């Protein structure tokens, strides 16, 4: 009865097999296969085998003998499955397609909040940790910058708010409900925990592949390996495919478990320091055994300590012994700093790692240098010789220094413990840069070069001032705006950056803000950058930090340059210089007092100072002319040969010696 | 007597006017009057040749006879009459000077411009002749026959007759008044005869002198006009320079030179309409750098020395669409373009302006997301960061739509024009005119009105409320300086002069100004050396350089 025929058209073999499969399914049912039904299947099978032309669509199938409405409906699943498999070549798609009668799986739109949440969950839970908590997930998704709309239910300060709806309870986080409904994410309560399902992880991988996002090499390699056997076996007959799919399921789990042992961010943090992945994995396992489900930052510190202990107490070759000796004094310095209660404790720990492994980090930097040199354009139009920190003869910048981004501690987002602080940390990990928070005498953001062995710090030639639109408006009104620009100009930086955050068109002072931007750029020479919100500003800081490092790293100390070029000031001398700028002399105070008089311009004030450097000297001169008011009024004009106009001369007299 | 009768008969025939008959009735010596008016019939033809305005002058000729009568009466009068006649002569002169002016103006108005000057000269001559006539009666009183001969001699030339007629007519006018007053009847024959020969001599001299005067006056006028024109020109130039220095004409003189490729895109229409609204001049043509805009200033030659930097504005704008920009970045050619621009314009600020860059990238990423292809996001963020860090004076600006692009370019043009004339930030300009008063001050408005209060706030670490306390006690700087400059008080006493002043607290509790603030104010205001830091002065650094006994 079930004799297989020769299929005339090779392309129809799949369809013929499908018909046989359907017949088998019906035969296995409790009802059994009736005579009429069996006859119908046999007729259809023969027609498919005898067809000379390929059957690609349901229309083609309906025109063949033996395929009526019922049979066409039955065969519909094959064509839907075939379309999906041809497009995506993915067995889970086939399976899902069969179950859902050919519907596509849910994939969130690019740069939507669901998209960001899904990818964030995938990245953060690949390395062993199974779930994330709500606030943690929200902050991480915000920091990734994958979503164009804010994720959190509360609008943080400094974020550009895009209104979705006037209802207060609606926010980007509402997408999580959709993800849970679609079966991509599961949730448990008290407290709320969110975890990806297997389906969710596959969808996240799909999103990453489609958008071309960078991901860790291991994860990519795993993703690449999985589809290969599936793709190869897809053209085979269906029974074979289903068998292969079943076989693969047990293999996926062990790999996921093995790979999920280490969070990706910890790997990203320690790899640049020269630690091997095996070392990091081993240390993390030991630490995670000791502690329960804690925050990655805590585990991060523990892993750091464990790695250092392993290095110190394990047997070392001679070179390592020499490194150990050299790192001794730095340890003591670090301890002193810890005693002082430095706010940059975490980041100094990072630097400790780099300090302990100078050669290793140098080699890793060398690798980066090679790759970046290959990618570089080679068309740098630098017209000025940059100021460099001190370098040994023949030493390159990257061999000696790290570039660190310093944020002012008066910035609200930079304060420790704030919610937006997490954004800063995520930027730190994403861009692989170091960020510290200190009190800056001028500006909101500077970059320093810190020596890898000596721990000395030098201020590089870049400074940024950040202002959002509302700040800008009030600053223009009460004149802080001009005062701050003047202080930035006098601070000695060569590259002045002014970042305007937010859209000035929404402000009622839009014209004055735009004019101020033009004046700042054209007249004062600032580089004015526009961003939409705090997240974009911080990402801009990240890109600038990497670019500054690129700018300096291949600088070499030549005798000619060292003689001609000036050196970067140290951080302490920079702070002192800025404090000195705020100090005034007696003549400066007198000049400012003169500037308060109507009709007195800057030239007039300077002319008065040339003749009378102090207020006392001017008052004495007026007292000598007592009882002759007209002579007193004209005194400054006469003595300056009309450089000081009559009205200004009279007004100054009124201030100093008028009744 | 017979001759007189004959002459009178002739006049009756020629002058039928009724006015003559009336006058003959008034005066009994009608025969003498008629004989004196012999030249009258000759006058009429020249009058007719001139404009009709001379017709009203006919009554003046009748007055001529009256003049002669009055002169005769003077000659025969006694000493008293001589004195009176002298006074009257003075008054006559003044009257005569007044009377011809309206006539002159009338004649000048009617007569052609070319004829005005000779008329003016004639008037001058007549006035001088009249003055000499006043002196004649005293010297020549008995030469009756010579007067008659002179009269007959003058009647022959027409021009001379005209001159004489005009002179006599004016004399008649003044004499009428005298005649009415005196009412004395005497013969007047010898008087005009004496005056005539002297008039001839003086007229010739007067003519040449007057011509010289004319030339002098004309030269003076020309010189004055020239000097006035020069002064006006100077003032105009100075005003223009001031306008330029203030930058009022900047927007009118700036010219935007736009590359044709910029206008070919979707931005062109909006940009042109915006520029025309503002009235900014545009020059469209191929620029050395593609898709660029550069600006120049059209400056008049007079004002060019004020701008040593010349008409070029060191700013260049590159305008790109999103797709073109992404292609340049992906191919690695964008930085080459920037380098080429900097080679061509070494000292210029370069700004790269893109339109719809972010929305374009998002759109392409979404398309790539749905239907995977070969497109990859170019490293835009890295390249833009590199512009900021690796290059000097290279900026970037990203607009969301064409309207924002046009608005930015027009705003940039206006700012480039106005910033050429603005002063840069300096320490003094930042704190001018009360700018140093902080916004938190409750008495901000009060302080801004008083220069003395602002001067107090300018002292470092003196808060506005401290300044108010000092101001209430010493409302002017002089009142405080007088106390500080008083030699009878000790330095220590002056330093703590202000310590007990009441300062109004925020909540309401008063506190004292304090010793430190009082000392600070004294030492800053009374410092002799302007170069010391205020922090050092507050600690008493001035005492090391000066002897304590100076104050």
Swiss-Prot record, chain A:
Note: Two distinct classes of crossovers have been demonstrated in Arabidopsis. Class I is MSH4 dependent and exhibits crossover interference. Class II is MUS81 dependent and exhibits no interference.
Name by which UniProt lists this protein: Crossover junction endonuclease MUS81
Lineage of origin: Eukaryota, Viridiplantae, Streptophyta, Embryophyta, Tracheophyta
Tissue note: Ubiquitous but preferentially expressed in young flowers buds, notably in anthers.
Lineage top rank: taxon: Eukaryota
Gene3D superfamilies: 3.40.50.10130, Crossover junction endonuclease EME1, DNA-binding domain, Winged helix-like DNA-binding domain superfamily/Winged helix DNA-binding domain
GO molecular function, one term: metal ion binding
Native source organism of the sequence: Arabidopsis thaliana (Mouse-ear cress)
Record motif Helix-hairpin-helix motif 1, residues: 59-78
Pfam family, one: MUS81-like_WH
Induction: By DNA-damaging treatments such as MMS, cisplatin and gamma-radiation.
Keywords: Calcium, Cell cycle, Cell division, DNA damage, DNA recombination, DNA repair, DNA-binding, Endonuclease, Hydrolase, Magnesium, Meiosis, Metal-binding, Mitosis, Nuclease, Nucleus, Repeat
Residues spanned by motif Helix-hairpin-helix motif 2: 585-622
UniProtKB/Swiss-Prot annotation, chain B:
Alphabetical list of CDD domains matching this protein: XPF_nuclease_EME (cd20083)
Protein role: Interacts with MUS81 to form a DNA structure-specific endonuclease with substrate preference for branched DNA structures with a 5'-end at the branch nick. Typical substrates include 3'-flap structures, D-loops, replication forks, nicked Holliday junctions and also intact Holliday junctions with a reduced efficiency. May be required in mitosis for the processing of stalled or collapsed replication fork intermediates. Plays a role in DNA repair and in genotoxic stress-induced homologous recombination (HR) in somatic cells.
UniProt similarity note: Belongs to the EME1/MMS4 family.
Identification of the protein by name: Crossover junction endonuclease EME1B
Localization (cell): Nucleus
BP-aspect Gene Ontology terms: cell division; DNA recombination; DNA repair; meiotic cell cycle
Gene Ontology molecular function terms on file: DNA binding; endonuclease activity; metal ion binding
Known EC number: 3.1.22.-
Stored SMART domains: ERCC4
Gene behind the chain: EME1B
Stretches the record annotates as Disordered: 1-55, 187-239
């Amino acid at each position: 009865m079930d004799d297989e025929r020769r299929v005339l058209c090779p392309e129809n073999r799949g369809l013929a097999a499908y018909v046989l499969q359907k017949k088998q399914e019906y035969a296995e049912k409790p009802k059994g296969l009736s005579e009429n039904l069996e006859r119908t299947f046999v007729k259809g099978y023969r027609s498919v085998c005898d067809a000379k032309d390929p059957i690609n669509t349901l229309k083609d199938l309906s025109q063949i003998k033996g395929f009526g409405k019922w049979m066409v409906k039955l065969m519909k699943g094959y064509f839907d499955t075939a379309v999906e498999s041809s497009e995506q070549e993915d067995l889970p798609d086939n399976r899902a397609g069969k179950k859902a009668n050919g519907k596509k799986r849910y994939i969130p739109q690019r740069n939507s909040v669901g998209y960001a949440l899904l990818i964030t969950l995938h990245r953060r839970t690949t390395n062993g940790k199974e779930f994330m908590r709500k606030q943690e997930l929200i902050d991480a998704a915000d920091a990734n910058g994958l979503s164009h709309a804010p994720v959190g239910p509360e609008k943080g300060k400094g974020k550009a708010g895009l209104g979705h709806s006037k209802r207060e309870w609606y926010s980007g986080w509402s997408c999580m409900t959709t993800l849970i409904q679609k079966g991509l994410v599961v949730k448990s309560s008290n407290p709320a925990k969110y975890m990806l399902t297997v389906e969710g992880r596959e969808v996240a991988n799909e999103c990453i592949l489609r958008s071309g996002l960078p991901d860790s090499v291991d994860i990519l390699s795993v993703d690449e390996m999985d589809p290969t056997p599936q793709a190869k076996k897809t053209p085979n007959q269906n029974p074979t495919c289903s068998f292969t799919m079943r076989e693969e399921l047990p293999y996926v789990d062990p790999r996921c478990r093995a790979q999920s042992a280490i969070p990706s961010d910890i790997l990203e943090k320690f790899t640049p320091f020269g630690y091997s992945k095996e070392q990091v994995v081993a240390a993390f396992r030991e630490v995670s055994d000791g502690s329960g489900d804690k925050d990655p930052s805590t585990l991060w510190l523990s892993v750091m300590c464990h790695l250092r202990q392993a290095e110190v107490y394990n047997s070392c070759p001679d070179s390592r012994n020499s490194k150990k000796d050299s790192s001794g004094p730095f340890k003591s310095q670090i301890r002193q700093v810890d005693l002082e209660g430095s706010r940059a404790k975490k980041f100094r720990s990072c630097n400790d790692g780099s300090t302990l492994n100078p050669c290793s980090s140098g080699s890793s930097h060398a690798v980066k240098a090679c790759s970046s040199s290959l990618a570089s354009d080679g068309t740098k139009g630098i017209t000025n010789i940059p100021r460099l920190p001190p370098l040994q003869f023949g030493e390159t910048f990257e061999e000696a220094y790290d570039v660190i981004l310093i944020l002012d501690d008066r910035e609200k987002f930079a304060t420790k413990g704030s919610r937006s602080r997490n954004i800063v940390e995520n930027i730190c990990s994403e861009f692989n840069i170091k960020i510290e928070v200190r009190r800056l005498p001028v500006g909101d953001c500077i970059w320093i070069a810190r020596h890898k062995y000596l721990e000395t710090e030098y201020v590089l030639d870049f400074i940024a001032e950040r202002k959002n639109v509302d700040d800008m408006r009030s600053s223009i009104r009460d004149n802080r705006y001009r005062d701050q620009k003047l202080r930035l100009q006098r601070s000695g930086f060569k590259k002045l950056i002014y970042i305007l955050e937010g859209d000035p068109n929404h402000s009622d002072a839009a014209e004055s803000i735009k004019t101020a931007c033009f004046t700042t750029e054209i007249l004062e020479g600032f580089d004015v950058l526009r961003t939409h919100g705090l997240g974009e500003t911080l990402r801009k800081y990240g890109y600038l930090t990497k670019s500054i490092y690129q700018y300096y790293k291949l600088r070499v100390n030549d005798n000619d340059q060292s003689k001609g070029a000036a050196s970067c000031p140290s951080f302490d001398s920079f702070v002192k210089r800025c404090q000195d700028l705020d100090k005034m002399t007696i003549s400066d105070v007198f000049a400012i007092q003169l500037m308060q008089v109507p009709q007195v311009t800057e030239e007039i004030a300077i002319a008065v100072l040339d003749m009378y450097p102090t207020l006392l000297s001017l008052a004495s001169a007026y007292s000598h002319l007592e009882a002759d008011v007209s002579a007193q009024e004209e005194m400054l004009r006469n003595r300056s040969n009309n450089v000081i106009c009559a009205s200004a001369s009279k007004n100054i007299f009124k201030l100093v010696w008028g009744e | 007597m017979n001759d007189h009768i004959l002459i009178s008969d002739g006049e009756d025939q020629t002058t039928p006017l009724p006015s003559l008959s009336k006058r003959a009735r008034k005066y009994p010596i009608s025969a003498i009057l008629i004989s004196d008016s012999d030249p009258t019939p000759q006058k009429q033809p020249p009058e007719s040749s001139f404009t009709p305005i001379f017709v009203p002058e006919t009554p003046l000729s009748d007055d001529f006879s009256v003049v002669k009568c009055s002169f005769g009466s003077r000659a025969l009068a006694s000493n008293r009459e001589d004195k009176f006649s002298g006074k009257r002569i003075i008054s006559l002169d003044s009257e005569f000077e007044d009377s011809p002016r309206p006539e002159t103006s009338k004649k000048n108005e009617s007569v052609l411009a070319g004829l005005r000057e000779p008329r003016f000269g004639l008037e001058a001559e007549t006035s001088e002749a009249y003055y000499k006539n006043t002196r004649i009666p005293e010297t020549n009183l008995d030469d009756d026959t010579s007067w008659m001969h002179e009269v007959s001699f003058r009647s022959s030339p027409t021009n001379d007759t005209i001159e004489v007629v005009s002179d006599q007519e004016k004399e008649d006018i003044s004499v009428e008044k005298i005649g009415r007053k005196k009412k004395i009847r005497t013969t007047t024959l010898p008087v005009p005869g004496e005056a005539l020969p002297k008039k001839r001599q003086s007229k010739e001299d007067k003519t040449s002198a007057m011509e010289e005067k004319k030339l002098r006056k004309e030269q003076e006028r020309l010189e004055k006009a020239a000097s006035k024109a020069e002064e006006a020109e100077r003032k105009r130039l100075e005003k223009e320079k001031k306008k330029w220095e203030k930058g009022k004409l900047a927007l009118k003189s700036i010219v935007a030179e736009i590359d044709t490729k910029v206008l070919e895109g979707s931005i062109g229409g909006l940009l042109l309409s915006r520029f025309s609204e503002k009235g900014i001049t545009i020059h469209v043509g191929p620029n050395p750098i593609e898709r660029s805009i550069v600006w120049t200033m059209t400056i008049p030659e007079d004002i060019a020395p004020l701008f040593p930097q010349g008409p070029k504005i060191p700013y260049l704008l590159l305008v790109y669409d999103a797709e073109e920009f992404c292609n340049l970045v992906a191919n690695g050619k964008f930085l080459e373009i920037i380098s080429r621009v900097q080679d061509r314009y070494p000292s210029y600020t370069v700004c790269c302006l893109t339109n719809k860059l972010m929305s374009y990238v998002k759109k392409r990423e979404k398309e790539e997301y749905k239907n995977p292809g070969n497109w990859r996001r170019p490293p835009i963020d890295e390249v833009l960061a590199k512009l900021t860090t690796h290059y000097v004076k290279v900026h970037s600006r990203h607009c969301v739509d064409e309207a924002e692009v046009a608005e930015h370019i027009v705003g940039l043009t206006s700012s480039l024009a106005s910033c050429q004339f603005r002063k840069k930030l300096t320490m003094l300009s930042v704190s001018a005119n009360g700018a140093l008063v902080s916004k938190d001050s409750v008495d901000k408005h009060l302080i801004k009105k008083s220069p003395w209060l602002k001067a107090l706030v300018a002292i470092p670490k003196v808060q506005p409320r401290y300044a108010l306390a000092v101001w209430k006690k010493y409302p002017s700087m002089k009142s405080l300086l007088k106390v500080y400059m008083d030699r009878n008080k000790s330095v220590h006493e002056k330093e703590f002069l202000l310590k007990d002043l009441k300062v109004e607290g925020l909540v309401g509790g008063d506190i004292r100004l304090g010793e430190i603030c009082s000392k600070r104010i004294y030492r800053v205001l009374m410092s002799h050396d302007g170069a010391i830091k205020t922090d050092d002065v507050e600690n008493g650094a001035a005492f090391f350089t000066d002897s304590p006994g100076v104050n």
